[in-house]
């Protein structure tokens, strides 16, 4: 009987965790995370923003590296329109030391990041958002009710950045959001490396 109860508790716990993944239309939580300049960053700091690209990103994943310039380009194109990029590294550096906070600082300086690169050292934000991979994009729209999840998934459909005819999912969603139109494709699959969870955080 005790074993059955334990199994049920594990199943219920798993369901509860699965329910924390954001869906389109959900209100996303804000955060207060440390940036590579050692300052704490919250979306509440951006008083004039219309929304945000929140992108789970890291140092060591080949997919994150492949998309790095495109993430920089997203910020260059949309920050001035009220949709700045905020990147968050959720990985456990105990699994891969390349994702340590010190290495994050080096990477951001080396690649000339123009946006915050935050460390989610407790992994609570990644779990709350339901992030699956790096990179994983969440486009949030600022409303009176809160930050509404308007798009989630991949940046585009070209992981190797070799196809001029790529479908720019994140840009298309942002353009629709800014124009006050419905986002035709609001969810895609995030293609990247799995997040390196702490053993106690899985």
Listing of model-derived features with the role each one plays in the protein:
Residues 105-141, 145-149:
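Short, internal strand/loop/helix patches
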Residues 65-110, 121-127:
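Structural microenvironment flanking redox-active thiols in thiol-disulfide oxidoreductases
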């Amino acid at each position: 009987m005790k074993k059955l109860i334990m199994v049920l508790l594990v199943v219920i716990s798993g369901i509860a965790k699965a329910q924390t993944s954001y869906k389109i239309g959900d209100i996303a939580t804000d955060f207060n995370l440390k940036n590579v300049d050692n300052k704490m960053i919250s979306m509440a700091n951006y008083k004039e923003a219309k929304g945000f690209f929140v992108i789970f990103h890291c140092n060591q994943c080949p997919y994150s590296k492949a998309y790095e310039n495109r993430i920089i380009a997203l910020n260059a194109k949309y920050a001035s329109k009220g949709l700045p990029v905020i990147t968050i590294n959720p990985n456990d550096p105990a699994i891969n030391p390349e994702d340590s906070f010190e290495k994050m600082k080096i990477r951001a300086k080396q690649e000339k990041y123009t946006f915050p690169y935050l460390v989610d050292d407790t992994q609570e934000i990644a779990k709350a958002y339901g992030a699956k991979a790096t990179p994983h994009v969440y486009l949030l729209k600022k409303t009176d009710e809160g930050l509404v999840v308007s798009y989630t998934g991949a940046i585009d459909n070209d992981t190797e950045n070799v196809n001029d005819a790529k479908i720019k999912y994140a840009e298309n969603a942002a353009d629709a959001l800014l124009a006050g139109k419905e986002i035709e494709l609001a969810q895609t699959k995030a293609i990247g490396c799995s997040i390196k969870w702490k053993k106690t955080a899985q």
